[in-house]
A protein has these predicted regions:
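Formylglycine-dependent sulfatase
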Residues: 1-277
Length: 277
């Protein structure tokens, strides 16, 4: 959350996301009930806690017998589309219930030249940067919809998920920003030993940090440089998402639908930038 200008970030400038929040409602104290990706996505889809919908890991499908808000809108006459990363059922890119148009891919997808599956049928590589690719597909779908019916467009960005690959435009956007380990990274006295041991593992600040550190664990003072490069790349990917939000905003405005459209910007979870180890 602190990588948004709207959240009083001292280093991030996200004017388009900020505009949505300032012109609408900004939930400053909203919290994710289950911080793992797929369980959280399932909760957004169906409005249930993880212990109710049963998606408790990143490999489980959302149960087809449970309701979802897209299915309800579809029943009410809405045109519905999902475009982007779905991430429930790791190897499944089939079309899901509740969507008239469904474009996704298996697993996490790739930042560049990703292979998408269209409506559970044809798979093809879409050249270019993921964020811009799904934005263009979203615009094309809205242009070709039935103007006489309301619509739901659900976009699933890959960014800013690891591994972090900013587009060239933002690859060096934060090179001059000083980044250090947060102070809370070392406030571990009240935590059990197994927790402290995780500092040297995949998600710990002394671990590989998404491949930005080649030799690990590394507790040397200079290893903070690897951490800093990871955070800079992470923030670079966010800038592209902000551009996408701005493009969709201006597009809706250009076709006269901005004031007739509810724009919801949310996420399945957030990244700890070294906080609490």
């Amino acid at each position: 959350w602190n990588s948004l200008g709207l959240a009083d970030s001292s280093v991030m400038d996200t004017p388009n996301i900020d505009r949505v929040g300032r012109e609408g409602v900004y939930f400053r104290n909203a919290f994710c009930t289950t911080t793992l990706c797929s369980p959280s996505r399932a909760s957004i889809l169906g409005g249930l806690y993880a212990h109710s919908h049963g998606v408790v890991n990143n490999f489980t499908e959302y149960p087809v017998d449970l309701p979802t808000f897209p299915r309800q809108l579809q029943k009410a006459g809405y045109q519905t589309a999902y475009i982007g990363k779905y991430h429930m059922g790791e190897k499944n890119d089939d079309k899901r219930p509740g969507f008239d148009y469904f474009v996704t891919h298996q697993g996490q997808g790739k930042y560049f030249d990703n292979v998408f599956c269209f409506n559970g049928g044809e798979r093809k590589m879409v050249k270019g940067y993921y964020t811009h690719a799904i934005t263009k597909m979203a615009v094309d779908w809205v242009k070709n919809r039935d103007d006489d019916r309301p619509f739901l467009l659900y976009m699933g960005h890959k960014a800013p998920h690891s591994f972090y690959y900013p587009e060239p435009k933002y690859e060096h956007a934060f090179d001059d920003v000083d980044i250090r380990y947060p102070l809370t990274a070392f406030h571990l006295e009240d935590n059990p030993d197994w927790y402290k041991a995780r500092l040297d593992t995949w998600h710990g600040i002394y671990g590989p940090i998404f491949d930005y550190r080649k030799e690990f664990p590394d507790r040397r003072a200079q290893s903070v440089l690897d951490f800093a490069n990871m955070v800079r790349a992470y923030r670079g990917t966010i800038k592209s998402v902000d551009d996408s939000v701005g493009y969709m905003y201006e597009f809706l405005k250009s076709i006269g639908e901005l004031d007739n459209t509810m724009i919801i910007y949310t996420t399945d979870n957030g990244l700890l930038e070294g906080e609490h180890g």
